[in-house]
Amino acid sequence: MKFGVLFSVFAAIVSALPLQEGPLNKRAYPSFEAYSNYKVDRTDLETFLDKQKEVSLYYLLQNIAYPEGQFNNGVPGTVIASPSTSNPDYYYQWTRDSAITFLTVLSELEDNNFNTTLAKAVEYYINTSYNLQRTSNPSGSFDDENHKGLGEPKFNTDGSAYTGAWGRPQNDGPALRAYAISRYLNDVNSLNEGKLVLTDSGDINFSSTEDIYKNIIKPDLEYVIGYWDSTGFDLWEENQGRHFFTSLVQQKALAYAVDIAKSFDDGDFANTLSSTASTLESYLSGSDGGFVNTDVNHIVENPDLLQQNSRQGLDSATYIGPLLTHDIGESSSTPFDVDNEYVLQSYYLLLEDNKDRYSVNSAYSAGAAIGRYPEDVYNGDGSSEGNPWFLATAYAAQVPYKLAYDAKSASNDITINKINYDFFNKYIVDLSTINSAYQSSDSVTIKSGSDEFNTVADNLVTFGDSFLQVILDHINDDGSLNEQLNRYTGYSTGAYSLTWSSGALLEAIRLRNKVKALA
């Protein structure tokens, strides 16, 4: 990635935009401009991906307010979900979406030797997070018990509270934000000698990494500790109850922060983090949570809805959560990585459902355009019939890429059992060629380094590519990604230039590049 070229483009765009004056008028300032003189080359996947990484990073950064960026109609550090201001209006900053966006920014920062422009964007995000935490809102305030107001899902781009009706609270946001910022502190220590980049700037609410830990990360973690066993709305903002995705990212945030708390001599809190993370791990895996359902042999995203017979429990969140909480090359105590048999079976069953559900998938034999969940009726601007989502499809590509990367990088054997058998046998390899007696066995182990292992690893990458081919076939000509693609025609629909869509594709390309770089 040639960051100098990319950021010079941003600077030119910024100079052409009007400065913000007076009260917020989100419709007065355009924040979308297509990547200069670019048109998607649909000739082949390799050609597309080689250029698209730079293009998707452009569109992601375009939706972040910071001095070197294009979007200036917001407090520095603000992430808009989309420039779309009507039909639908996504011109807000969501706690969850912002944190996930910055996890992608951190991936770029880590892969590019702590690029200081990206580091500044991250620190502006941390700064605006401090202010948002202390903005009273319909969910509560910072001074409430366990900082109740941190469960507020979204804010206006000027940092003021959004006071309209919404699904409140959403308990995944504080956890994801705590994890993202904690990960940045580790990057600062490992890649930049513990030095922040904005401490000499005005209007910054921290002067050290300890300030960030005590005043920004810790309050989010206290919220998680206080409310992890309370119901809230899911990541799709539609249903209140217990959610696999929410509990998983909460467990990740707590477990990840234990060592950080210890590094700042906060031993008692580290113990609380550790014990609560352990409780959450048991809750995720056990009968209390109800997420692992052996009757159906897959993860149930919302057990309450299954009990009410309103949903079967299949949901792309059951593989998005594992991907977000298990970065490549990271040692993690968080359960349910993508190699978990129940996660894989959930992934497989959703794929099988979506192949039949969405007419656009009739053109594909392997990967497919994937939606949020089978019962979805949100069409991008109202209710009728749900569509596939670009981000769900990009994350679907990441699953086999990560399976291949983890197995090859650690020289791990690949174990196939009765639960994940259908996925491997249908899409990756004919298991009868490996073990003719497999179906009478409990499992088969494919030894690392064997010819069969190399075949499976290569086929996993090919299978991941089949999802990116779907994206190539339906991405906008300018390389931007909407929220959805029409279930019949494949044309883009819903909010345009969705930040999360670009981020999910970026992460898929990153994973693909890393697994292909392995010998």
Swiss-Prot record:
Q: Which UniProt keywords apply?
A: Carbohydrate metabolism, Glycoprotein, Glycosidase, Hydrolase, Polysaccharide degradation, Signal
Q: Which residues form the signal peptide?
A: 1-27
Q: Which GO terms describe its molecular function?
A: glucan 1,4-alpha-glucosidase activity
Q: Which reaction does it catalyse?
A: Hydrolysis of terminal (1->4)-linked alpha-D-glucose residues successively from non-reducing ends of the chains with release of beta-D-glucose
PROSITE patterns, per the entry: GLUCOAMYLASE
**Binding residues for substrate, per the UniProt record?**
166
- Keyword Ribosomal protein recorded: no
- Write out the catalytic residues in the record: 234 (proton acceptor), 237 (proton donor)
One Gene Ontology term of the biological-process aspect is: polysaccharide catabolic process
Name the Enzyme Commission number(s) assigned to this protein. 3.2.1.3
Family from the record:
Belongs to the glycosyl hydrolase 15 family.
- Supply the name of the protein: Glucoamylase GLU1
State the organism named in the record.
Answer: Saccharomycopsis fibuligera (Yeast)
Show the taxonomic lineage: Eukaryota, Fungi, Dikarya, Ascomycota, Saccharomycotina
